[in-house]
A protein has these predicted regions:
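Flexible, glycine-rich beta-alpha linker
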Residues: 122-150
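A glycine-rich helix->loop->beta "capping" turn
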Residues: 20, 44-56, 79
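N-terminal Rossmann NAD(P)H-binding glycine-rich loop of SDR-like oxidoreductase domains
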Residues: 4-23
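Catalytic loop of short-chain dehydrogenase/reductase
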Residues: 63, 76, 80-123, 135-139
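Adenosine-cofactor binding site in Rossmann-like domains, unifying the SAM/SAH pocket
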Residues: 27-46, 60, 66
């Protein structure tokens, strides 16, 4: 299978890319480090279109949602295509519990992504959409916090096992990780 992943050079994207590559899948890695900015949607789309699965992981402003629309539009009606969208468990918490305006902005951007996925699902057409909401995941090697974090490689391996549940099962939404208080 050919899999495109935004934000593949660090954190969750890197862990998923590593595992899928080890399983023999062809990875199309898209990140700023290799010249693919998530805001350059036409450029990204040319790399994503020939793939079977797209992991919509990188997030800058509302570009993640805009890219979802572009890929969905391009893949509409094409059987076998799947888009995995990475959000956050933070969206399950009240906005008043967030530590500041920067986190509130991130929260609103992820809420927009999640609502877009829910609305696109009503079209009941290909591509299939999956929403993944990580809890606390240690995405940096030296990450420390008073809160517990899941190991990113273990988290990614667990997610892939769930996503590979079989052809007769469709996974629409996953909340996976250490939940935020």
């Amino acid at each position: 299978m050919k899999i495109a992943i935004t934000g593949h050079s660090a954190g969750i994207g890197q862990a998923l890319a590593k595992i899928y590559a080890a399983q023999g899948h062809e990875i199309v890695g898209l990140s700023r480090r290799n010249g693919y900015n998530i805001r350059s949607i036409p450029k990204l789309l040319t790399m994503i279109e020939p793939c079977d699965m797209f992991i919509n992981n990188a997030q800058v402003g509302f570009a993640q949602t805009e890219l979802l629309f572009a890929v969905y539009r391009s893949w509409q009606g094409k059987e076998g295509k799947k888009i995995i969208n990475i959000s956050t468990m933070l969206t399950s918490a009240p906005v008043s519990s967030l530590p500041g305006l920067e986190m509130t902005e991130y929260y609103v951007q992820k809420q927009a992504l999640e609502e877009t996925i829910r609305q696109l699902r009503h079209l009941r057409n290909w591509p299939k959409l999956c929403l993944v909401k990580p809890g606390g995941v240690a995405t940096q090697p030296d990450q420390t916090s008073p809160r517990p974090y899941a190991d990113v490689d273990h988290w990614a391996a667990t997610l892939i096992k769930i996503l590979d549940a079989g052809p007769d099962l469709e996974v629409e939404e996953i909340a996976l990780g250490v939940n935020y208080p």
